[in-house]
Amino acid sequence: GDVLIDLVDIGAGTRGLDYIQCIPGGVPGEKHAPNLFTHVDRFLFVNLDGKRFIKEDARRDVLRDAMLDQPKAIAWTIVDADGFEQLKNSKGPENEVALKTGTLYYADSIEDLAKKIGVPANNLKEAVDTYNKGC
């Protein structure tokens, strides 16, 4: 931010600064953020109600707006065990740290995961079932 302002002050041009692009993953106050959204065909987003609210392959600006519209602007990224395994080569270290620090959760069932992340199990199950039918 500060360097950009200094560059503009000395004449640097800018473009596209009237919007932001964002993707999920950051946990406020945490140094190690889990990364589960590399492979769009392996994850889904749910809100604090456990409901899927967007197609995960949407453009970043559409994702941003949809996430910011959710309760408390929070969304969970849900990935199955196979998807998590696929990420080990590229994102394994970050995800392992996130598991240890409690910013990433592992569960043996949808009901267990719902309990860990504090969402209604029936909504999460419906979101996962609907997602799986579309794959």
Write out the residue ranges for each language-model feature.
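Gly/Ser/Thr-rich active-site loops/lids in small-molecule metabolic enzymes
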Residues: G1
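C-terminal catalytic domains of large/alpha subunits in multi-subunit enzymes
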Residues: K115, V119-C135
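An anion/pyrophosphate-binding glycine-rich loop and adjacent beta-alpha core
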Residues: L4-V119
